[in-house]
Amino acid sequence: GLQLQGLEVVMICHSEIVGKPAAFLLMAEGATVTVCHQMTRSVAMHSRRADVVVVAVGIPKFFGPDMVKPGAAVIDIGINQQELPNGRVRIVGDVDTDQVKEIASWITPVPGGVGPVTVGILMRNATIAHQRQIEAGWLAA
């Protein structure tokens, strides 16, 4: 996996659920974290110096190629519906993946990137919690 110690991480989000906990977890791993939100001026100025960028703003293709440092890792947490000219809908992230992947060294796709990992971790945690309830005598085996 990616060693975070000493890396510059920019989180472009403003979320009590994702942003703050993730920022604290990243800092605990030794990363220097900058959190940008809707009131941040010149978001691209911050993101262009980052080794890792995490994007969760709810705006389709918000994060473009002019916002990323060559070789950076980009984690797209956004899930957006985009209507196509034929009336169909497709799921896209907050990152313009087709453009950014030419510059970044690593990028998560949407769909199929962060979502399946989240589901897997939730299932693992639910299993651990259930086992602990059995061990504590709260549930029958």
Predicted regions and their residues:
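Rossmann-fold NAD(P)-binding glycine/threonine-rich loop
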Residues: 70, 75-138
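Glycine-rich phosphate/diphosphate-binding loop of Rossmann-like nucleotide-binding domains
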Residues: 1-73, 77, 82, 88-90, ...
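Flexible, glycine/charged-enriched surface loops at secondary-structure junctions
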Residues: 6, 64, 135-141
